């Protein structure tokens, strides 16, 4: 083992591993991520990667979660979270950014990965989606343009957020990053609620 490899082993962190994994996804799609390919990208042995992740499934789950986090980092303009229409437009912009930065990440094949018995990956994705849903709920609660009393125990902010997010996911799968349909639905629904 060379001195450079020893130094690299000591310098490798989960963040470095996830950054290398994201780079592999950008270059070759998420199927390119494996223990060996990430180790090669980090210039470390596969054993070093196994020190952090027990399996390829665990590495993929963590990588997918980190991609979602990169896509949905908090904006510099916190006003995004005070207005439902601005927030929805921002989410669509972030989906479009994610598609450009990580081509194919949102494909049905990627979503299928989460259904193949990879419980850790599915939990991580659901946690990330939960974060997005909770954010939408907060925006719905705090938007001064939403009529007071529009939500109650029969139709909650979370139920409406789930409908909106479902519409967004369908748009993403179709690679349609125009928020106008979702915004129209939001406007119509808010008027009728």
Describe every region a protein language model picked out.
Residues 96-135:
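Short secondary-structure transition hinges
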Residues 109, 164-168:
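Short alpha-helical scaffolding segments that buttress acidic/His motifs in well-ordered protein cores
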Residues 65-70:
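Short, basic, alpha-helical segments at the C-terminal edge of helix-turn-helix-like DNA-binding modules
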Residues 117-118, 129-161:
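Hydrophobic alpha-helical bundle segments that form small-molecule/ligand-binding pockets
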Residues 1-12, 149-151:
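N-terminal intrinsically disordered/low-complexity leader segments
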Residues 16, 20, 24-58, 62:
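Helix-turn-helix
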Residues 62, 76-101, 157-161:
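Hydrophobic alpha-helical connector segments
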Residues 185-193:
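Conserved small/polar residues in nucleotide/adenosyl-binding loops
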């Amino acid at each position: 083992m060379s001195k450079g490899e020893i130094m690299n082993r000591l310098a490798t962190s989960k963040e470095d591993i996830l950054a290398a994994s994201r780079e592999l996804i950008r270059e070759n799609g998420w199927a390119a991520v494996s223990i060996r390919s990430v180790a090669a990208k980090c210039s470390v042995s596969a054993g070093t990667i196994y020190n952090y992740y027990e399996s390829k499934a665990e590495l993929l789950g963590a990588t997918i979660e980190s991609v979602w986090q990169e896509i949905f980092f908090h904006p510099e303009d916190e006003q995004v979270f005070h207005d439902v229409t601005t927030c929805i437009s921002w989410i669509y912009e972030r989906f479009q950014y994610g598609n450009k930065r990580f081509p194919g990440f949102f494909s049905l094949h990627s979503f299928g990965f989460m259904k193949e018995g990879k419980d850790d990956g599915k939990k991580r994705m659901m946690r990330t989606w939960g974060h997005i849903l909770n954010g939408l709920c907060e925006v719905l609660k705090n938007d001064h343009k939403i009529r007071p009393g529009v939500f109650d125990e029969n139709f909650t902010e979370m139920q409406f957020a789930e409908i909106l997010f479902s519409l967004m996911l369908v748009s993403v799968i179709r690679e349609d990053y125009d928020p106008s349909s979702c915004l129209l639905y939001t406007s119509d629904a808010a008027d009728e609620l």
